[in-house]
Swiss-Prot record:
<comment type="similarity">
    <text>Belongs to the MSDIN fungal toxin family.</text>
</comment>
<comment type="function">
    <text>Probable toxin that belongs to the MSDIN-like toxin family responsible for a large number of food poisoning cases and deaths.</text>
</comment>
<dbReference type="InterPro" id="IPR027582">
    <property type="entry name" value="Amanitin/phalloidin"/>
</dbReference>
<dbReference type="GO" id="GO:0090729">
    <property type="term" value="F:toxin activity"/>
</dbReference>
<keyword id="KW-0800">Toxin</keyword>
<feature type="propeptide">
    <location>
        <begin position="1"/>
        <end position="10"/>
    </location>
</feature>
<feature type="cross-link" description="Cyclopeptide (Tyr-Pro)">
    <location>
        <begin position="11"/>
        <end position="20"/>
    </location>
</feature>
<protein>
    <recommendedName>
        <fullName>MSDIN-like toxin proprotein 5</fullName>
    </recommendedName>
</protein>
<feature type="propeptide">
    <location>
        <begin position="21"/>
        <end position="34"/>
    </location>
</feature>
């Protein structure tokens, strides 16, 4: 189980960083559009 958790950790961390980056990109596009 520890091997599976260790293998999934980078994936979970990577996924947790996606929403803020995507939200920032969307806000920049909306700001430029306005």
């Amino acid at each position: 189980m520890s091997d599976i958790n260790t293998a999934r950790l980078p994936y979970v961390v990577f996924m947790s960083f996606i929403p803020p980056c995507v939200n920032d990109d969307i806000q920049v596009v909306l700001t430029r559009g306005e």
